[in-house]
Amino acid sequence: TGGNPRFVPIVCTSGQHRALLDQALTVFSIVPDHDLGVMVPGQSLFYVTRTALARFEPVLRQEQPDLVIVQGDAQTAFVGALAAYYSRIPVVHVEAGLRTGDPYAPFPEEMNRRLIDRIAALLFAPTAAARRNLLAEGISDESIVVTGNTEIDALLYVRKSVPPRIRFDLPGRIVLVTAHRRESFSGGIARICRGLRRLAERNREITIVYSVHPNPHVSRVVRDELSGAERVTLIDPPDYASFVHLMADSALILTDSGGIQAVSYTHLRAHETPEQLVCRLLLEKK
């Protein structure tokens, strides 16, 4: 809020992916006012939805906010918007209007963001293309503000102002990999890993660095397929600042992440590196 006394932010986190969340909050000196503590091993979409909805309701009753701001397309973002709607509190959606056109790709994020955009009273679209998507769906132009991408804002701030906690001293050209999307669980992650193994075997000048998501549906497969592979280094997800600098040091980024897709382009423009390959069948129209 920049210290504006008209606004009093109340931060509520879902608690999903605890280690990843805590390190990101630390970088930006954010201390949540409420933590829903949703995460449990092997959680399903049904569990996340009902648990987050039940735990967010008393927060809304206690705080009685004038607005609820949700960002992105995660299941908890949708639940936050739905809980606010049930409480008759206006919703603001950050990253509104991103679309692939297929309700099952990415799953469940594509449907989550469509539903959030129907609930929201004010929609912060990251691009003019996202605004056009919203207009095409019949959403009023007066409800849409093109704001730019907050992930890119965060990356630029960290790259300039926050040194990495970890520096990766690796030989050759770095190929950085992340892959974790739910639609890749049924064989997709394994196929990506086998492709990476072949890539490393055929290109002796590279080192593949795979930042392995903690979800067991991902980590178990990746470690089974790639542990011990030549010129492949598996790492736990580093802190946010270290990852930003690792991206900048990479010659190629292979990812299925929409967020990394967006910020990789910023690195590309700033450094003429890295290139990126997006491991998904459909992309958001950004």
Regions found by a protein language model. Name each.
Residues 12-19, 119-187:
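A nucleotide-sugar donor-handling region in carbohydrate enzymes
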Residues 5-55:
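Conserved nucleotide-sugar phosphate-binding/catalytic loop shared by glycosyltransferases and other
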Residues 266-273, 277, 285-286:
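Conserved small/polar residues in nucleotide/adenosyl-binding loops
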Residues 70-71, 93-94, 123, 243-269:
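A donor-sugar binding/catalytic signature common to diverse glycosyltransferases
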Residues 22-24, 43, 161-249:
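Donor-nucleotide binding loops and adjacent catalytic segments primarily
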